[in-house]
Amino acid sequence: MVDSKKTETPQVVDASKKAENSKTSQAGRIQFLSAPKQFSASDVRSSPSLADLDEIAYEVRTTSIASPAEIEAVCQLWIRNTEIPADKVALIAIDMARAYADVGASRKAVLLDAPTLAPTVARSRLAQLKAGAGISPRQFCSYYAKIVWNLMLHKNEPPANWAKIGFKEDYKFAAFDFFDAVDSPAALEPSQWVRHPTDKERAAHGVVKWASLSRERLQEGTSITTVAELNKGHLGGYNNLPALMAPPS
């Protein structure tokens, strides 16, 4: 008796051809995905590749830190108007920033003595000339923050007033008011580091800075008049440190 059902012949598929077709298809998809539109610098909607971004020569700048050109202008003022040796001017600039670390980098700061490399030129005179370049002591010092940090560690000489302003001994090297510029890419980079600041040193500086600003706010007070009957003769705040605001989270 003959089976009426049609016998199906199995199809033999070449495994090597199947794998080759799969690879070809996959390669085509990869090529399609990795071929973005060509970047056009005249089209603001065009997205640049990493290679395109290499054309941008950006210099990190911030208004809180003097630029190399501004520091150079200060040094030229010193050379033209004083007897400092031109071949030592960079070291004298660092000496000035180190002196500000002891007394505070503000226009009210009184700089003492003279740099050892220019013993006939008072630091106070150099500070006056620096003001003529249009940059503040804080901007000037912040440029050298990393160098000053290195110098103090290298010589084991912390800022003079570290205990007076409330730092513990473990964090005393962070006790200068332009310390936050040590982490800024806009500050002059040392050729080598003694060490980088620790997180605890950063935190200690932040807390003491916050406390100092709070003290100033309390001393300023909230009075809007000088009439003695109203302010009872007080010109500053009535509260002391326990009344400080909560520290920032």
From Swiss-Prot:
Belongs to the potexvirus capsid protein family. The keyword Glycoprotein does not apply. This is Coat protein. It holds the Pfam family Flexi_CP. It is found in: Virion. Required for genome encapsidation. Forms ribonucleoprotein complexes along with TGB1 helicase and viral RNA. InterPro entries: Pltvir_coat. One of its GO terms (cellular component) is ribonucleoprotein complex. Its main location: virion. Disulfide bonds: none annotated. The lineage of its organism: Viruses, Riboviria, Orthornavirae, Kitrinoviricota, Alsuviricetes. Keywords: Capsid protein, Helical capsid protein, Ribonucleoprotein, Virion. The keyword Cell division does not apply. Residues 1-28 are annotated as: Disordered. It comes from the Viruses. PROSITE patterns: POTEX_CARLAVIRUS_COAT. GO terms for molecular function: structural molecule activity.
